[in-house]
Amino acid sequence: MGLSRRTFFLGTTAAVGAGAGFFGARLVEYLGAPPEAPCKTLAPEEVETLGALADELIPPDPPAAWNGGRGHPGAREANVVRFLDWHLAPGAALAGDRETYRVHLAKAKGRAAAEVEKDDPKFFDLLLRHVKMGYYGNPRYGGNAGYASYRMLGIAGPGCTGRDVPPGKKAG
């Protein structure tokens, strides 16, 4: 019996889909992160304040010999602000914290993270938790652009297992 049209169609559709997914991911890696879209939930002054605080919490590294002459990006460069903008939008995962951010970022404008921590520890804890989520999370959620934290930690990325630990490093 020969190959039916249905089997042929299903097989070629699956192959084309798998190839598009594989090569599309490689193209994104080659071209780099997409250009940063403007924030839609946060106001420009909130974006600036949040970016400054986030970069104090996870600052960029200066260029270093151990990283091929490059430092690791800080929170702002790793798209943590955009991550938070997306997740604070109405209906998104952190939408319930939107008003908290609006009020407390206005108070924090022009202030150092240490001052915010001292004067407003509850908001500071929330901010720190969310900045870490954006920096260390899976890039598919909008942060950790270019796998910044994964490269810094020397891990393969999402879905890595103990077998993916680089030589000379211990798992766990």
Task: Give the label of every model feature segment.
Residues 2-7, 19-56:
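C-terminal segment of N-terminal export signals and the immediately downstream linker at the start
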Residues 32-37, 58, 81-89:
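Short, charged, low-complexity loops and linkers
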Residues 52, 64-172:
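Mature-region segments of soluble proteins
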Residues 61:
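Glycine-rich, often acidic-flanked micro-motifs
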